[in-house]
């Protein structure tokens, strides 16, 4: 027993160590960001204050309000001394206008310097990359992020969904559920909401809150539509496969269903065993009298095998649904990589590293779901390799689009409004309907603790990746 639990302990310790190091890195990064923000706020406040004092002193230096009024309005009139106080008030409003002009100029300078920094930070901007080099970089990066996780999958000591690997597989499934939920709520949905939030912040006035609710509401509806679509697909597949299963053993399934509602479940099972034994005796007597073997010996037991076969088919549906969601997700990753390489070689490399860090834990979770669905290790890896087609298609789409418009919108979170939230809905459905129920099986307290830690490890990984992005 101790030898069997060695691998789960090792995986749990590795996940906890990885999460702890990530939290330390995130804490240091957050401290630096806070220091930069405080320094920027102090610099901006001091500069604005000195400028405002200088302008206020300038308004007092004029002495007479009518001269400043004539400069502001462009005409000259005679004013008495009693009106000069009103003119000073106008001079104060002029100072406010000048301050707003300073803010606009400062924002323009900041934007210009930021753009210059981006060009200098990316050593190879898109004008320096010809078409062949651009395609080579983008497709090579896509192949890298698709093939790199397989080196990690080779190290996982899980060959199939067997009792010998059940404890480790349950921990990997919990890690997969945490990764799927974290990816949906911390990566896909926030990226889909980012352009809408920026749009509402840029609009002045108090009427933007109503106009900004439409796009945000559409993102939520697309998430729900993804959940409903995956539910409809799974029910349809189960209906097709279920009708085939009931044709083999309808009587056994019906009696077993009725027996599960009563409190005497053991009595029902013993009666079924007795009836099956009687049927076996009758069939053997018929075979002896006829001198042939028209009925197989395992005939009465076949409905039970058909029921198990139906359950296996139902489990494979969840694996295929997860592959469909992963295919759409890889398509968006390919769009982001293609658009980033159009913006520059440095930006493309940075985006590739970010997507790679995101894909490794995600592919480990997908592997666990496929193995739990009934696939062997080789079959699961082959099916995951097919999802790389989605990433290559996304990269090609971003490179073929004029100016990389579609790819840049997807990379920034805008894109077609249904891609990211619909994929998030699929991830939420797979995690909550297909994966989490498998973790509710009876287990030892230590195994349950490791499963909870695995789920938290998957969420923490997505938190760290979102922080790096």
UniProtKB/Swiss-Prot annotation:
Induction: Down-regulated by Zn(+2).
Modifications made to the protein after synthesis: Rapidly phosphorylated by CK2 following Zn(2+) treatment. This phosphorylation is required for efficient cytosolic Zn(2+) release. Methylation at some His residue by METTL9 leads to reduced zinc-binding.
Regulation: Phosphorylation activates zinc transport activity.
Bias (Basic residues) ranges: 242-263
Coiled coil regions in record: none
Keywords: Disease variant, Endoplasmic reticulum, Golgi apparatus, Ion transport, Membrane, Methylation, Phosphoprotein, Transmembrane, Transmembrane helix, Transport, Zinc, Zinc transport
Post-translational modification Phosphoserine, affected residues: 275-276
Record PTM Pros-methylhistidine, positions in chain: 66
Basic and acidic residues: compositionally biased ranges: 42-56, 66-114, 264-285
Region (Disordered): 42-121, 242-310
Catalytic activity: Zn(2+)(in) = Zn(2+)(out)
Impact when changing residue 275 to A: Loss of phosphorylation in response to Zn(2+) treatment and of cytosolic Zn(2+) release
Membrane association type: Multi-pass membrane protein
Sequence intervals crossing the membrane: 10-30, 138-158, 169-189, 214-234, 381-401, 417-436
Major subcellular location class: endoplasmic reticulum
A Pfam family annotated for this UniProt entry: Zip
Localization (cell): Endoplasmic reticulum membrane; Golgi apparatus, cis-Golgi network membrane
MF terms in GO: zinc ion transmembrane transporter activity
Tissue expression remark: Widely expressed.
GO cellular component: endoplasmic reticulum; endoplasmic reticulum membrane; Golgi apparatus; membrane; nucleoplasm
Function: Transports Zn(2+) from the endoplasmic reticulum (ER)/Golgi apparatus to the cytosol, playing an essential role in the regulation of cytosolic zinc levels. Acts as a gatekeeper of zinc release from intracellular stores, requiring post-translational activation by phosphorylation, resulting in activation of multiple downstream pathways leading to cell growth and proliferation. Has an essential role in B cell development and is required for proper B cell receptor signaling.
PANTHER family, sorted: ZINC TRANSPORTER SLC39A7 (PTHR16950:SF25), ZINC TRANSPORTER SLC39A7 HISTIDINE-RICH MEMBRANE PROTEIN KE4 (PTHR16950)
Family classification: Belongs to the ZIP transporter (TC 2.A.5) family. KE4/Catsup subfamily.
Subunit structure: Homodimer.
Associated disease: Agammaglobulinemia 9, autosomal recessive: A form of agammaglobulinemia, a primary immunodeficiency characterized by profoundly low or absent serum antibodies and low or absent circulating B-cells due to an early block of B-cell development. Affected individuals develop severe infections in the first years of life.
Name this protein carries in UniProt: Zinc transporter SLC39A7
Organism name: Homo sapiens
Origin organism lineage: Eukaryota, Metazoa, Chordata, Craniata, Vertebrata
């Amino acid at each position: 027993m101790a030898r069997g639990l060695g691998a789960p302990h090792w995986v749990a310790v590795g996940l906890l160590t990885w999460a702890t190091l990530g939290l330390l890195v995130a804490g240091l990064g957050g401290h630096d960001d806070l220091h930069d923000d405080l320094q920027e706020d102090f610099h901006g406040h001091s500069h604005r204050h000195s400028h405002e004092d200088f302008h206020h002193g300038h308004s007092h230096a004029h002495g007479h309000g009518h001269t400043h009024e004539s400069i502001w309005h462009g005409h000259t009139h005679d004013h008495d001394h009693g009106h000069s106080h009103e003119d000073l008030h106008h001079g104060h409003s002029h100072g406010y206008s000048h301050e707003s002009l300073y803010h606009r100029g400062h924002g323009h300078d900041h934007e210009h310097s930021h753009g210059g920094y981006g060009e200098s930070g990316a050593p190879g901007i898109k004008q320096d990359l010809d078409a062949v080099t651009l395609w080579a970089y983008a497709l090579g990066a896509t192949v890298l992020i698709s093939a790199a996780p397989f080196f990690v999958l080779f190290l996982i000591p899980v060959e199939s969904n067997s009792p010998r690997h059940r404890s480790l597989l349950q921990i990997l499934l919990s890690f997969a559920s945490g990764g799927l939920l974290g990816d949906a709520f911390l990566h896909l949905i926030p990226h889909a909401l980012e352009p809408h939030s920026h749009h509402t912040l840029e609009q002045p006035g108090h009427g933007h809150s109503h106009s900004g609710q439409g796009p945000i509401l559409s993102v939520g509806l697309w998430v729900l539509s993804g959940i409903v679509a995956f539910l409809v697909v799974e029910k349809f597949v189960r209906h097709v496969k279920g009708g085939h299963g009931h044709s083999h053993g309808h009587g056994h399934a019906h009696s077993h269903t009725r027996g599960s509602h009563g409190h005497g479940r053991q009595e029902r099972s013993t009666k079924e065993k007795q009836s099956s034994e009687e049927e076996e005796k009758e069939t053997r007597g018929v075979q002896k009298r006829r001198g042939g073997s028209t009925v197989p010996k395992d005939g009465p037991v076949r409905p039970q095998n058909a029921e198990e076969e139906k359950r296996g088919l139902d489990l494979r549906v969840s694996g295929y649904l997860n592959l469909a969601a992963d295919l759409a997700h890889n398509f968006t990753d390919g769009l982001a990589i293609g658009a980033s390489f159009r913006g520059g070689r440095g930006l493309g490399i940075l985006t590739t590293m970010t997507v790679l860090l995101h894909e490794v834990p995600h592919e480990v979770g997908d592997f666990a779901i496929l193995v739990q669905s009934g696939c062997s290790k080789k079959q699961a890896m082959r099916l995951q390799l097919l999802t790389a087609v989605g990433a290559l298609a996304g990269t090609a789409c971003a490179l073929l689009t004029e100016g990389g418009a579609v790819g840049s919108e997807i990379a920034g979170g805008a894109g077609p409004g249904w891609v990211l939230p619909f994929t998030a809905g699929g991830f939420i459905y797979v995690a909550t309907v297909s994966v989490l129920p498998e973790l509710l099986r009876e287990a030892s307290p230590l195994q349950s603790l490791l499963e909870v830690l695995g789920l938290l490890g998957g969420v923490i990984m997505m938190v760290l990746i979102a922080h790096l992005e």
